[in-house]
UniProtKB/Swiss-Prot annotation:
This is D-amino-acid oxidase. It comes from Zea mays (Maize). It catalyses: a D-alpha-amino acid + O2 + H2O = a 2-oxocarboxylate + H2O2 + NH4(+); D-alanine + O2 + H2O = pyruvate + H2O2 + NH4(+); D-aspartate + O2 + H2O = oxaloacetate + H2O2 + NH4(+). Residues 112-121 have a biased composition (Pro residues). One of its GO terms (biological process) is nitrogen utilization. Its EC number is 1.4.3.3, 1.4.3.1. FAD binds at residues 14-17, 39-40, 51-53, 174-176, 332, 344-345, 362, 364. Pfam families: DAO. D-proline binds at Y261, K332, G362.
Length: 386
């Protein structure tokens, strides 16, 4: 006889992974379970609210395990958009995706623009013919903050605002709940999910098994002079600011709201304790504005573009580049999901669905979680004698 599914699930982290886990727990066919979610500041207040929201079917195909996760998640995004009215609720839409080489210096172009280049992009912005990277069948987008909040709201989860101090573990090695700063006692749980992005490693139960590092990424959001002229074309740019300088790889995502999101300028850096204190670095923000102006006169501040946001966030990274999804070795009922790097919004749904199956059914069916198990790091530490 199989064990009964847990009745009390506490999710730590109100980003896309935590929200999707809450949704799939609550909508589980056989054992629907509405969880409690603990979030330090507000749902989607960190990377899940400041990411680009780009979705790709097959861009992870070079890594088989990640390919299966990404393809399952891309399909789930379409299903969720149908179920939750994603087009209106959080800007879900298929997009065209292009690779564009920006010239280092302004160039007057007498030749007609390349037919692949959308009309809102200046003809002089492309130093070579653009390449098609994705079609509306293989690439799409969401507004990540709105998506995260919509999925969380649909789950019906109780949201507790507070900082998770530690995971409480019973004498028999089974999870007992979480301790929240400033809250008396333990928030009882039969199962705990740690989905705290780059902050996951601050908890001892995680840091004893593996490390999570941060990658600081900058972004700006602009409202162009004529937003109605901006078409759903996502641009992956290559740009060398000066001869001999490092090649930059910024990205441009127009949104259905008429806003345009531009990101790039990343560096390895661990996040501060409080997500609410994160700010962008002036030089990185200035470079993104420079790049935006090279792409389109519609995106130049001096020509009427409105600055909606200048911001930064931290992406969670692991030593081997793969996410960590599964039960933490030695702590029965304590699960972790982090390390998705720049693919967190894409892979959030399949991660949440797989965790819900693992917690309620005892095994994930939507995708094989073995390659993502935190136990893989125990083997490596053992080989190193750690």
């Amino acid at each position: 006889m199989s064990a009964a599914p847990p009745r009390r699930v506490v999710i730590c982290g109100g980003g896309v992974v935590g929200a999707c886990t809450a949704y799939f727990l609550a909508t589980h066919a056989a054992s629907p379970t509405v969880p409690t979610l603990v979030e330090r500041c507000a749902p989607a207040c960190a990377a899940s609210g400041k990411a680009g929201g780009f979705l790709a079917l097959d861009w992870c195909d070079s890594t088989p395990a990640l390919s299966r996760l990404a393809r399952a998640s891309f399909a789930l995004h379409r299903r969720l958009a149908d179920a939750l009215g994603g087009a209106d609720a959080y800007g879900f839409r298929p997009v065209h995706t292009l690779s564009v080489l920006l010239p280092p210096h302004p160039a007057a172009s007498s030749s007609p623009p390349h037919p692949l280049l959308p009309p809102w992009v200046d003809p002089s912005a492309s130093a070579a013919p653009p390449r098609e990277l994705g079609t509306p069948d293989t690439t799409a987008q969401v507004h990540p903050g709105l998506f995260t909040k919509a999925v969380l709201a649909a789950s019906g989860a109780e949201v507790v605002i507070g900082e998770v101090e530690r995971v409480a573990v019973a004498w028999d090695g089974r999870v007992a709940g979480v301790v929240v700063k400033g809250r008396d006692g333990v928030l009882d749980a039969d199962a705990v999910v740690l989905a705290l992005g780059p902050w996951s490693g601050r908890l001892e139960v995680v840091s004893e098994v593996f490390d999570v590092s941060g990658l600081k990424a900058h972004s700006i959001v602009l409202r162009p002079r004529e937003p109605e002229k901006v078409t759903p074309h996502c641009l992956f740019l290559s740009y060398q600011p000066e001869p001999g300088a490092k090649m930059l790889d910024p990205e441009v995502y127009p949104r259905p709201t008429g806003e345009v999101y531009i990101c790039g300028m990343s560096k390895d850096e661990n996040p501060p304790d409080d997500p609410a204190t994160i700010t962008g670095e002036p030089d990185s923000i200035a470079m993104l504005h420079k790049i935006a102006g090279k792409v389109s006169s519609q995106l130049k501040k001096e020509e009427g573009a409105e600055v909606v946001a200048e911001q930064a966030c931290y992406l969670p990274c692991t030593a081997d580049g793969l996410p960590v999804i599964g039960e933490i070795p030695g702590v029965k009922g304590c699960y972790v999901a982090t390390g998705h790097s720049c693919w967190g919004i894409l892979n959030g749904p399949a991660t949440g669905a797989a965790l819900a199956e693992l917690i309620l059914d005892g095994k994930a069916k939507i995708v094989d979680l073995e390659p993502f198990s935190p136990a893989r790091f125990l083997k490596r530490r053992s080989r190193r004698g750690v």
